Amino acid sequence: MLIEFGEQSGEKQVVIVGAGFGGLACAKKLRKSRSCRVTLIDRNPYQLFSPLLYQVATASLPEDDIAFPIRTAYREVQFVRGEVSNIDTTAKTLTMSNGKTISYDDLILAVGSEGATYGIPGVSENTFQMKSVHDARDIRRSLLRTYEDVEDGILPLERLNVVIVGGGPTGVELAGAVSELQREIQREFEHIAPKATVTLLEAGPRLLPSFHPNSSKYTQKN
């Protein structure tokens, strides 16, 4: 099945794959143009405000507070939910995972990035990434389940140490939020909460390496 959204009006068909910050910024600017029709494709029907994922991961914010429906916010953009399985640049078509084909005149790929493991054995299998709502949900479940299991004697006290790799803004924010969560659970887990710790690892000489050194010093002290 071939879908050509702009065929009847003669408009240029611009397809954007990825509804992250980059894809949505393009869609917002292009939709103001009367000379093109914009189609936005993403596997999720919502815009994710990823800088606040750490708050979802530590039960500080509900998921709905950082996920905004794309169809509601961008009514002038044709939204297609799904995943692209193939791109034919000669025919200028995209094939979706459900078998449907979408034609385009111009294609913008804004699919984002994946967490880097740097080829370190065991990273993918034994750590949590934090790139999506599902990742944040998994972290939250694991944290709360670990507290319960240590309290019940199923897991040893050593499992209360949360290790965060990466001393950039996300790592620092997550470390602070986990520390706050550990303080908040003291009433429910008064016997084990004092044993809970957070370890933040950074390969470079200081935290927040992209920030001013004074910010790094302040962060490290606090």
Spans of features found by a protein language model:
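Rossmann-fold NAD(P)H-dependent dehydrogenase/reductase core
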Residues: 215-222
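FAD-binding core/adjacent interface of flavoenzyme oxidoreductases
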Residues: 1-11, 78-163
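Rossmann-like NAD(P)H-binding beta-loop-alpha module
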Residues: 141-195
